[in-house]
Amino acid sequence: MSDQVKIPRATLKRLPLYYRFVSSLKSKGIDRVNSKAISDALQIDSATIRRDFSYFGELGKKGYGYNIDSLLDFFKSELSESDMIKIAIVGVGNLGKALLTYNFSIHDDMTITEAFDVKEDVIGQKIGNVIVKDNDELITTLKKEEIDVVILTTPERVAQKVADELVQAGVKGILNFTPGRINTPSDVQVHQIDLGIELQSLLFFMKNYSE
């Protein structure tokens, strides 16, 4: 990624969408795609797609579109998916167990390798391919395994305390499923997942944009 151009956050958040769609085209044997096809599939206007791609140099040619293999190579490099990304989950309640069972089954380059909880009846359980560890081992394990991405699914009342421990362990990215906002240093990225807001957004788009 260019060091001279600051990429908008909205563009960066769309990269995984583009990557997943282009990967699906590759699996179907398609070797090129244009911005209109991407637009129709992802419901993102073509101008936005072209602008997003323009931040990263010449990814396509006018009249030809984008080469699938070239796009995949580019997205993998930008998303740091050339190597396996190890992820930890903290809080193994119903949602945590569901995420462990799913464990990014459609993403070959990401996997949850560690899980932590405080409940004695959960610690030691094997869920999917992961054995749940005592939360007392959190900081030590994250440092040892060099894990810098964590999914947070704890109760809201302890979310900030756990977040502070994650920062202490060197974590740089937190996907926060707890209802409360957490405070972290500026170099730690937090993405808040509020299912209520996501559903409201979905209903809005269904009402206003469905044909």
From Swiss-Prot:
This is Redox-sensing transcriptional repressor Rex. The keyword Transcription regulation applies. The keyword NAD applies. InterPro entries: CoA-bd, NAD(P)-bd_dom_sf, Rex_DNA-bd_C_dom, Tscrpt_rep_Rex, WH-like_DNA-bd_sf, WH_DNA-bd_sf. The gene is rex. Keywords: Cytoplasm, DNA-binding, NAD, Repressor, Transcription, Transcription regulation. Homodimer. Its main location: cytoplasm. One of its GO terms (cellular component) is cytoplasm. HAMAP family: Rex.
